[in-house]
Amino acid sequence: MYTILVVDDSPMIVDVFVTMLERGGYRPITAFSGEECLEVLKTTPPDLVLLDIMMEPMDGWETLGKIKTDPATRGIPVLMLTAKPLTPEEANEYGAFIEDYILKPTTHHQLYEAIEHVLARRHSITADIERAREAGIDPRIIDEYERLSKGVDINRRLLKILETTYSIKDA
């Protein structure tokens, strides 16, 4: 059972996501602010973080930055969860640090698909890395492979979000 940290400053929204995750067979844990999220990560590292963007005083982007600059937490995948459409500037600035971007409101199917996609990609890359290490491939090449594999997939997903949000394909 995967543990997922839900971070949102609205207790009602946290409750909704906790219920959805429990019904999906996940083990949710919660935080109600960016600071609380960082504290929870120190004691109970999850398999994945669902992080709201529009929180105060520390918003989700700042919280994401702190997660990704801490060596102890940088490897934890983060899905941004927000009612705010992704802007091209945000995709460019934060795309390398997030695993996916989920717009609220969302359905349980969309949530589960995003979570499973991230976890499956993570397992696939981890297996590839293990095989590469066993084959004696240079660790620098392995690190670059990991970075590029994740980046290509995330950029495809962000591109799809931007195309949908801004009707780019219909223009």
Regions picked out by a protein language model, each given a short descriptive name:
Residues 121-171:
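CheY-like receiver
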Residues 39, 61-74:
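Short amphipathic alpha-helix used as the core "switch/output" element in two-component signaling
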Residues 62, 85-102, 109-113, 126:
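Alpha4 helix (beta4-alpha4-beta5 surface) of REC/receiver domains from two-component response regulators
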Residues 15-23:
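Charged docking surfaces used in two-component/phosphorelay signaling
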Residues 44-50:
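Active-site beta3 strand of CheY-like receiver
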Residues 55:
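Receiver (REC) domain active-site loop signature in two-component systems and cognate sites
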